[in-house]
């Protein structure tokens, strides 16, 4: 039985930073994550993607941010149960919780922080004939950009109208031989600055932007079994426009799934856990939810916001674990950081 003060479910940036904040209060943490390594989406889906809205970092690669967070929390010696999924929870008479994973690993904790990002995440896929054929063995359909160098000097078609599609269009412009972005509408859902950059790049013929259109067919090379072109249908026209490509990236976002946590008796709204913004507690005393997995009025799914939520959550968890202790806020600039 693994015993800890706070059991954190999810080893993404929010969960990792919660370890640091807990360590400042001398609270021990243990983290469960279904992935084989810490970092969540940052490490698994886009480690080479630059992030621009972390305070103090004009730009930082997602993978480097994870590395820095791991270095920051090392002094607090967190435990990890990786490659396993939290399945069942039991609340004991003393107020502690027993969480058991799909592999049977048991954890006892005085507080639970669910920081699972989107839970188990799967890409939203277009409905296309032969899609599964081109998904396997590097045949041309990709849903994530883990290593941009894979697309060096290649012809890339991106479909989507959100931040992910826009960001990778901008980034791959200087990597790929050709970049085409296709959106079924004229209005984009992404950040206005990114939208303007893509518009400007199209005007300068650095990329090709095709709107009011969607990919409806895939074509491959008979000898290599690799994707060679996508067929595009445009509103108001009957003929397909074929664009030759080496890779097709349908970036329509992720489908969030809470998995077994959905059966833990928590108030849930559209696959997100409802919380009180005072301390990011759920309707079950002792269980908190922080990061992208929670929801509340005005919620912003930003790493920065997750850090804030983790900080307030830990303060509340301390009061729950040590109800008779006074917690005086200490500044690290004055007191430094004392590890375990």
Place the predicted regions along the sequence by residue.
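Rossmann-like NAD(P)H-binding beta-loop-alpha module
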Residues: 152-175
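A conserved FAD-binding loop/helix module that cradles the flavin
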Residues: 168, 293-340
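N-terminal Rossmann-like FAD-binding beta1-loop-alpha1 element of flavoenzymes
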Residues: 4-31, 168-173
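Conserved N-terminal glycine-rich FAD pyrophosphate-binding loop of Rossmann-like flavoproteins
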Residues: 36-60, 191-195
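Glycine-rich FAD pyrophosphate-binding loop
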Residues: 23-44, 180-190
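FAD-site-proximal beta/loop scaffold in flavoenzymes
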Residues: 129-150, 247, 251-304, 312, ...
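FAD-binding core/adjacent interface of flavoenzyme oxidoreductases
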Residues: 1-9, 29, 37, 79-154, ...
């Amino acid at each position: 039985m693994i015993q800890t003060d706070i059991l954190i479910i999810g080893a993404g940036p929010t969960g990792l930073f919660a370890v640091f904040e807990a360590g400042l209060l001398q609270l021990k943490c243990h983290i469960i994550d279904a992935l084989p390594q810490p970092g969540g989406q940052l490490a698994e889906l886009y480690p080479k993607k630059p992030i621009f809205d972390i305070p103090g970092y004009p730009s930082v690669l997602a993978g480097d941010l994870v590395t820095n967070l791991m270095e920051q929390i090392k002094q607090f010696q967190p435990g990890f149960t990786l490659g396993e999924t939290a399945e069942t929870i039991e609340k004991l008479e003393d107020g502690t919780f027993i969480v058991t994973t799909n592999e049977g690993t048991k954890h006892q904790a005085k507080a639970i922080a669910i920081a699972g990002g989107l839970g188990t995440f799967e890409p939203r896929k277009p409905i296309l004939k032969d899609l599964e054929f081109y998904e396997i063995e590097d045949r041309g359909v990709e849903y994530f950009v883990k290593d941009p160098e894979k697309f060096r000097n290649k012809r890339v078609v991106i479909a989507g109208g959100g931040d992910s599609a826009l960001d990778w269009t901008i980034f791959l412009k200087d990597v790929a031989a050709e970049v085409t972005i296709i959106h079924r509408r004229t209005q984009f859902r992404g950040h206005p600055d990114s939208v303007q950059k893509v518009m400007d790049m199209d005007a300068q013929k650095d990329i090709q932007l095709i709107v009011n259109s969607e990919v409806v067919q895939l074509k491959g090379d008979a000898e290599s079994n690799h994707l060679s072109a996508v067929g595009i249908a445009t509103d108001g026209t009957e003929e397909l426009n074929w664009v030759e490509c080496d890779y097709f990236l349908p970036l329509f976002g992720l489908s969030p799934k809470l998995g077994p946590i959905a059966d833990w008796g928590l108030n849930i709204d559209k696959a997100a856990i409802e919380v009180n913004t005072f301390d990011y507690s759920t309707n079950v005393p002792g269980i908190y939810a922080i990061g992208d997995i929670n929801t509340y009025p005005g919620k912003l799914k930003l790493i920065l916001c997750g850090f804030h939520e983790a900080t307030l959550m830990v303060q509340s968890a301390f009061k729950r674990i040590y109800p008779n202790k006074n917690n005086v806020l200490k500044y690290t600039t004055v007191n430094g950081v004392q590890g375990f």
